[in-house]
Amino acid sequence: MSVHIELPRELRPLMKKPLGTLYRGKGRDTIEKFAGELGSPTKLISVGDVTTFHLLEVGIIPDICIVDNRTKRKPVSSDVSARNMDKVYSEVSVDNPAGIITDELIKTLCEAFASEKPIRIFVRGEEDLATLPVILLAPLDAVVLYGQPDEGVVFVKVTEEKKGEIRTLFEKLISKNQNYELDKLRRILDGHKNS
């Protein structure tokens, strides 16, 4: 049985607010604005096709990239799709519908974080909400990068404080009274290995 967390309509405006520092601009220029701040993160994760494409174009290889071959709900160009299939990556595919975070996505993210090899997670559906579990599951001092449509790239440094912010958001999504399966997802997202 598949379990999922759905983002209620009333919380969707929260997702339009950047979860970190927004670097305004387009393409390579935007990446160059924050490239010097990357340092040596414990893990570098990119969420989104266009962000991943521009990182790879400037020679920055994320440890984990999460893509769906779409941008703003339309197919990406063949150039973007081809570049994002860089041979350095092992690929895993998951189903994850729009507006939802599935248990399959969360389990795949856990496996990707445990891997020493670069992983490309191809999402059949939509990857937009993946940023939330990525921040919770990432090690401290990781960096998460994702696109903010028509504005630029959001740079999130994973800290205890940032994890706390995202945990608070998840508590709104998963009430304490929900079923055992959702409780298992909550424990995984809180960093517990027992599932």
Curated annotation (Swiss-Prot):
Belongs to the GTP-dependent DPCK family. Pathway: Cofactor biosynthesis; coenzyme A biosynthesis. Keywords: Coenzyme A biosynthesis, GTP-binding, Kinase, Nucleotide-binding, Transferase. InterPro entries: GTP-dep_dephospho-CoA_kin. It holds the Pfam family DUF359. It catalyses: 3'-dephospho-CoA + GTP = GDP + CoA + H(+). HAMAP family: Dephospho_CoA_kinase_GTP_dep (MF_00590). One of its GO terms (biological process) is coenzyme A biosynthetic process. Its EC number is 2.7.1.237. GTP binds at residues 49-50, 68, 127, 150. Catalyzes the GTP-dependent phosphorylation of the 3'-hydroxyl group of dephosphocoenzyme A to form coenzyme A (CoA). This is GTP-dependent dephospho-CoA kinase. One of its GO terms (molecular function) is GTP binding.
